[in-house]
């Protein structure tokens, strides 16, 4: 009887682990699909009034928040308010590229492609928040 109880408990633990593992794998798959599907729209900088605008992007495993300062139709500054990532800190260099090229869809940082995309989308969302709906 004791062996059956131990066996049943082990099977229960294994079943729970299998369910949790499957849920985690589904989350990872969903995250990867979301990032891969990201597209970028270039906002018309000349139409954006001077000011500082905030934007965020959250794709579960990576989250970013930025404050974008626009002056005279140019991106003058991007402040990183938040960047939750696992190994994507090098992607933060993409913010300087956006300022230098004055466009959102710059090349991603090698080895930090997903974080680069999330940061670019946060900047785009900040700039789009200025457009009347």
PLM region spans:
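Intrinsically disordered terminal and processing segments
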Residues: 1-65, 69-133
């Amino acid at each position: 009887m004791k062996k059956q109880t131990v066996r049943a408990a082990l099977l229960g633990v294994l079943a729970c682990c299998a369910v949790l593992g499957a849920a985690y794998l589904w989350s990872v798959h969903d995250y990867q699909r979301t990032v891969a599907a990201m597209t970028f729209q270039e906002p018309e900088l000349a139409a954006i009034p001077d000011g500082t605008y905030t934007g965020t992007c959250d794709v579960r495993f990576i989250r970013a928040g930025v404050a974008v300062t626009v002056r005279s139709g140019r991106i003058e500054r991007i402040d990183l308010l938040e960047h939750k990532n696992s190994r994507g800190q090098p992607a933060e260099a993409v913010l300087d590229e956006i300022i230098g090229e004055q466009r959102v869809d710059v090349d991603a940082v090698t080895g930090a492609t997903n974080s680069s995309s999330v940061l670019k989308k946060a900047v785009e969302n900040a700039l789009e928040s200025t457009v009347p709906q």
